[in-house]
């Protein structure tokens, strides 16, 4: 019989070790694998929610109806525009500046200044600007004033989205006009004391500016076409009476339409 303090044989130690059951290892591996699908389940749930946000359905008339998009905070980025001012419009711009900058600053939330050295009006967005098209509207407003339109007419570009400015030269209509013939064409468009121009404006619901050999027309797309047709007819030499008759017909059609 060995002493109580004697070392045990190696064979006894090996016989006392209990091997790990393979089933237990497989069970541990299954537990580790099951950890990943829990995260995938969250991803699937998030993708399902995003799919619900962009869900599309068809209404009774067969038109697609989308769920409204959520408002996301847009990144603030400074954008600038420069509107060149002709030399002959610099003095009117300075005189009417107290009436020009309030709509740009208060309505569009833009930063604006006159650069005397470069003879331009500089526009810049601020952190208070919410309309993405504010910079373009401000540029159109200032450009309309530099072309010769009144402030009240130019402000309409800020309030209405369907107004445009179309510009063309008299020689674009008839390239052979020179000297006195060109002067007579300009006189036919303007009329005595501007009566012909006012008649075209009232009939076509537009505003017309005659700047030397250039014609600028402000209004809606269809109205601009009507006004341009009358101006082109006068340039080509049509009698004013015939042009007035055509304008009356156009005005009657517009009245019936609206």
From Swiss-Prot:
Keywords: Cytoplasm, Nucleus, Ribosome biogenesis, RNA-binding. Required for small ribosomal subunit (SSU) synthesis. Has a role in the processing of early nucleolar and late cytoplasmic pre-RNA species. This is Pre-rRNA-processing protein pno1. It comes from Emericella nidulans (strain FGSC A4 / ATCC 38163 / CBS 112.46 / NRRL 194 / M139) (Aspergillus nidulans). Its main location: cytoplasm. One of its GO terms (molecular function) is rRNA primary transcript binding. It holds the Pfam family KH_PNO1_2nd. The keyword DNA damage does not apply. GO terms for biological process: endonucleolytic cleavage in ITS1 to separate SSU-rRNA from 5.8S rRNA and LSU-rRNA from tricistronic rRNA transcript (SSU-rRNA, 5.8S rRNA, LSU-rRNA); endonucleolytic cleavage to generate mature 5'-end of SSU-rRNA from (SSU-rRNA, 5.8S rRNA, LSU-rRNA); proteasome assembly; ribosomal small subunit export from nucleus; ribosome assembly. One of its GO terms (cellular component) is nucleolus. InterPro entries: KH-I_PNO1_first, KH_dom, KH_dom_type_1_sf, KH_PNO1_2nd. Belongs to the PNO1 family. It is found in: Cytoplasm; Nucleus, Nucleolus.
